[in-house]
Structure formats: C-alpha cells, structure tokens
Amino acid sequence: MRLNVEVVLLILTTPNITPTGLVLVSNAVVSWCGNFRIRNGLCGIRNWLRSLGNRFDIMAQDLLRGERVLAFDLETTGISTNSDRIVQLALLGVDSNEAPIHFETLVNPRMPIPYGASDVHGIYDADVRGQGDFSTIADETFELIDGAVIIGHNARNFDMKLLGSEYLRMGKLPPKPKVVLATLEVVRRLKIARPHNLGALCKRYGISLENAHTAAADA
C-alpha cells in the first residue's frame, strides 16, 4: 500500500502543486469525510492544504482511521477489461481495526497467457497450472473490497472494471468499494510530466519499487 500512498503524498507536498491538483485532493477528502464543508472556495482550499505542508500524510492517516484501506493491483492476460482474465491479485493494507491485511495469490485464468503479457509480469502458464480459478477466491476478494477504501495506480478504469467482469462472468455482482483513489488520475490531473507509469513515478519521488509488475509490488 505504501507505494501508491507515498506517490500521492509526495506529489501533494511539492511546492509547485497546482490549484487543479488541490481541488482534486479536496474532493477526495470530502469523499472520505462527509461532514467537511468548503467555505472559502478555491482560495480557501489552496491555502488550507498548502498550510498543511508535510503534515498532510498525518492528516490522511487520521481521515482514514476506522476504514479498511487496501492497495489493489492485478496482473492479467491482457488489457481488455471485458475479455481478459486475472492471473495474479494482491490486496495489501489494514482493516478498520488497523490489523494488517496481506492477500496475494496467483489465479488460473483458464486460458493461455499470451507471451506479451508474460513478458511484462513474468507469470507463465506453468506458474498458474496448479492454481484455482477466480471462483476459488471470489468470496474472500468480495469481503475485502466491498466497503473499503481502494488505492491503485489505474484502479478505477482498469483493475476494478476487469475485476467486475470476472464477477459478472460468474453471474455475481462485483463488490462496491467506499471510494477508489487512482494515483494515475491524480498525476494526470496535476499535469505532471510523463511518463506516468508507476515505476517512473516511484523513481522520480525516490520510492523503492522492487519486483515491478507483480501485483503485490505494484500495490
């Protein structure tokens, strides 16, 4: 979980953060804290968040206290959220009582993994041959994600959509997180220089990323 969270917090505390970025973050704050009211418009939001400086990480921890907060990442057979399948799933974080959660598993997609996908994440047909398919982890995954705060680099437009397709394929409704925070959306809205992939962002902000393109490492 720390990688995606650290990317957000380090971006937020840089001196040249833009008003657009501040508005985006304030919206996330509002979604986590329903009784928050914006009273002074954009200027008030900007000044308030800038005044927090490096204390924003402490504030974020306070806002999320009592929530199940999970970094989420998938490795898949491809990039289609409708037809491709999960080959690895990771959910890392804390429960509402601050107990650690580390759920990481390989998944048999019941289809050949294309070589192009294997070249990216290093998972081959032989690695998943003895694993269960998604139906064997569907219930546990649902219980973890439903009602949780989910953080991932492209979680809203890719991971959650592809996960939803797996559930619909089984004839089940997918879990509904309380909120999904996609770090990719944050960096794009802040107009941070490309590249926007997680590895490049971690390098830019001095965050160690080992075993990139495994679900647990990316989460």
Per-region residue spans from a language model:
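Short, positively charged low-complexity motifs
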Residues: 6-12, 19-21
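Acidic donor-binding loop at a coil-to-helix junction in glycosyltransferase catalytic cores
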Residues: 217
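Conserved non-catalytic scaffold segment of RNase H-like nuclease domains
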Residues: 48, 53-178, 192-213
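A short, structured active-site edge motif that brings together acidic residues
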Residues: 176-187
